[in-house]
């Protein structure tokens, strides 16, 4: 009889992080996947990170997750997006060697302490009914093997009753030539989970040797490339270029003439696709005034002959894809290695989850990744690590849930959005979703999260020591700059003019001036050069934003106060005077854990919040008396 503390179903980005996190904390963990060879597979684009997404990768890394370390072993074109803007919206991104990424992830997972991997298909799970809610008991594989578990994490990606479409052709699959998961979808439905359908897509893969790159815009990465992981010193792989081309009026004419053949225009038109990553058919239809759309030709590896054309996701028939591609500059003689396609799949309403990502209907069942309505490797990884941590912690009946708030991390923003607001289309993170993005930056994810993770045993002692060394260095340099006084005359000697009022200013305060940076200050104070480049950058960013932090602090304190005003799980909202029936039903369904969460539920009025607060205070005072 096989027994585990935690079982994770799915070996994608979410499943890998969930399994590793649970195992790291000490849970006896089993990862079940259709195929060990596809663990860590990059199903769509061969890249990690981007705007907001790159910050999530660093947050996962700060919690000792895998994604940051793995991409650093596969990065072949690294860049910081939005570099010309403020550090709060910088987006680390790395083009990956697809094979190296998969192999590095598999190497991590297959050698992880406390973690076992099983190649099987799970068709069902069972529960016990000896408590107020059904409680996870076991999973049953396709060959009827029963595996007992205390906690179960579903990270099924696009496999939950997935169907692939290419034109009028369709077949059950979660990924090209990989079977979908039908049994689990039926099991979830039997427990009355609210299931919906979403879709996503991928472009055709192209033969590199059939592309004419001359005349196309070359896109080199940063020199030197920046690593994602706080534990990585550098990127050691050769860096190669991507190339930029674009569609044109001829391309759009081919697409318009064949719109009726695209699956997304017919069979799938009622199923929502990612709003911010539309297919080329949807781009042409929605933005009819535009004559071109960018297409990024991204290599799939150092030794790969395959090119990923980012920007032309399609569900048109293969012959239409071929005709369309040949109208694009550089692709006149292109050969398709694999057709683009669209995939539709089941997801559950994420409002049926707590902030821990445990379901409200079944105790011990957690969901993470695309099953919760998100899109993207990074969003999946962020959910996976939270689900894994909480599943492992909850093995102790007196555990404190590990919940990241909106002021803690982009992961916290995402999960709060999902479980509070739900989603009717694939959810993607953006910096605009975060109220406190000045604090939620890519440079300080370790300062924000590593200690929190260490306290619950999700972070290794080695990483914790690395964090403390960094904090010491940052504090030392910050104190030096705050104690160092500079006169306007000293700055003028280095070509920097500020108000000649004779007023003494600290070097730290001067950094808030947009015309002054660490390069200038290091010419005046040589000791700055003794610090690591990352420390210098960290202190400079903190100094630049310091005046804004002061203004934002009141907002954050108000937010924290509301988040810390807990609402008992067993509260009966029907007993609160002044709440409409509609609001009572919403609150009873959502079961918000705090006043802050209740306030963010659509339709819950300020007056309702006041009534809830009055009720909580009244009963608190009653208990005291």
Swiss-Prot record:
Similarity annotation: Belongs to the MnmG family.
GO MF, one annotated term: flavin adenine dinucleotide binding
Gene3D superfamilies associated with the record: FAD/NAD(P)-binding domain, GidA associated domain, C-terminal subdomain, tRNA uridine 5-carboxymethylaminomethyl modification enzyme MnmG/GidA
Function: NAD-binding protein involved in the addition of a carboxymethylaminomethyl (cmnm) group at the wobble position (U34) of certain tRNAs, forming tRNA-cmnm(5)s(2)U34.
Annotated positions binding FAD: 10-15, 122, 181, 370
Classification via HAMAP family: MnmG_GidA
Any one Gene Ontology cellular component term annotated for this protein: cytoplasm
SMART domains according to UniProt: GIDA_assoc_3
Cofactor annotation: FAD
One Pfam family per UniProt: GIDA_C_1st
Keyword annotations of the record: Cytoplasm, FAD, Flavoprotein, NAD, tRNA processing
Subcellular location: Cytoplasm
Source species: Ehrlichia ruminantium (strain Welgevonden)
UniProt binding sites for NAD(+): 273-287
Gene this protein is translated from: mnmG
A GO BP entry: tRNA wobble uridine modification
Assembly behavior: Homodimer. Heterotetramer of two MnmE and two MnmG subunits.
Name of this protein: tRNA uridine 5-carboxymethylaminomethyl modification enzyme MnmG
Region (Disordered): 204-226
Coiled-coil stretches noted in the UniProt entry, renumbered to this chain: none
